[in-house]
């Protein structure tokens, strides 16, 4: 609203929007009285009808499924453009980019004065070393995120919980630790986050609820429990919660001793790179690149002709050649034999 002309009607639609406001916004959208709308998953609902949807922007696109993205863009018909934004593209997205269905712009530069985040891995048995490091950071007036996968202790899953970790840390750093998770009321969450922003607390023990949408420049350490249980894109997003100020930021991945080989590879990828595209490429090699013709986000497809992992340069060259032909060639009759073969082939079974 601060950027755009005041004459442009801009609205927000989320779970917090009250019933009366929702009805008004939905009606105004349909009547073309709202020109720009910001929203959560609430926008995907069938009752949300746009008068003339021309442009969809999906931020943190890895949080949305393929069907959801298509459902939203389809609300605009054939004239709707789609912009996806993500720090870590998921494998299927990367593959579609290689195939030319998406144009990609890469912003590799960091904002001024930001340093690369240093990522370490530590075994759970080395918790004393981690606590010692945290104590030093707090003494230097820095703040810490401590992320756990569960809210409460589970008998079925051997994962760290925020309640247990909060209790542990509160004894070591009394009065300096705050607790945050999804079951806390929204108003209370905002109070906790504001108190952390204003440095009332030095440690915030949280679930992955902090993954997106927060910016605390003074927080320069994040510790992630059971890090091997998270996907690479989520770990990369969590790590991005720190390193937003001028000081050196650190990410510590807490691990069990009995890691699988695949888990070790994923952890090493994260330790070796802060580049979202590099991470997504390595993730694609590990998990597969998704079902190009369907809705699967990952999983290996056995290409007999070529595949995006090993033949990326070939696909990029082919895309350039197609664009050249479209622009320069007036007589395409010489390509008819190739087109005939394509038409006759069972393209899905012959190539995939």
Language-model features: locations:
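Inter-lobe coupling/hinge segments of SF2-like helicase ATPases
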Residues: 1-268
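Accessory helical-bundle/CTD segments and flexible terminal tails appended to RecA-like ATPase motors
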Residues: 194-203, 210-217, 222-225, 240, ...
């Amino acid at each position: 609203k601060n950027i755009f002309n005041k004459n442009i009607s801009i609205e927000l639609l989320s779970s917090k929007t009250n019933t009366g406001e929702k009805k008004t916004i939905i009606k105004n959208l349909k009547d073309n009285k709202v020109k720009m709308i910001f929203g959560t998953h609430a926008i995907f609902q069938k009752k949300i009808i746009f008068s003339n949807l021309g442009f969809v922007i999906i931020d943190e696109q890895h949080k949305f499924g393929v069907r959801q993205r298509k459902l939203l863009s389809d609300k605009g018909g054939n004239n709707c453009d789609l912009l996806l934004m993500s720090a870590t593209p998921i494998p299927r997205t990367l593959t579609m980019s290689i195939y030319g269905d998406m144009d990609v712009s890469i912003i590799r530069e960091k904002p001024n004065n930001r340093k690369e985040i240093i990522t370490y891995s530590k075994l759970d048995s080395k918790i004393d070393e981690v606590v010692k490091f945290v104590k030093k950071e707090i003494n230097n007036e820095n703040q810490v995120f401590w992320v756990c996968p569960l809210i409460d202790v589970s008998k079925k899953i051997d994962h760290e919980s925020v309640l247990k970790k909060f209790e542990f840390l509160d004894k070591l750093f009394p009065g300096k630790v705050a607790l945050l998770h999804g079951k806390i009321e929204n108003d209370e969450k905002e109070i906790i986050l504001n108190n952390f922003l204003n440095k009332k607390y030095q440690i915030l023990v949280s679930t992955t609820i902090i993954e997106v949408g927060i910016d605390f420049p003074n927080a320069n350490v994040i510790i992630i429990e059971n890090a091997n249980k998270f996907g690479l894109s989520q770990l990369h997003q969590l790590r991005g919660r720190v390193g937003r100020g001028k000081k050196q930021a650190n990410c510590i991945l807490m691990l069990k001793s009995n890691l699988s080989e695949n888990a070790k590879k994923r952890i090493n990828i994260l330790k070796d790179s802060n580049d979202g595209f590099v991470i997504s490429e390595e993730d694609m090699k590990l998990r597969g690149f998704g079902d190009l013709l369907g809705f699967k986000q990952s999983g290996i497809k056995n290409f007999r002709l070529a595949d995006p992992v090993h033949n990326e340069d070939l696909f990029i060259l082919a895309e350039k050649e197609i664009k050249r032909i479209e622009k320069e060639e007036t007589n395409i009759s010489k390509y008819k034999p190739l087109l005939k073969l394509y038409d006759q082939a069972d393209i899905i079974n012959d190539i995939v």
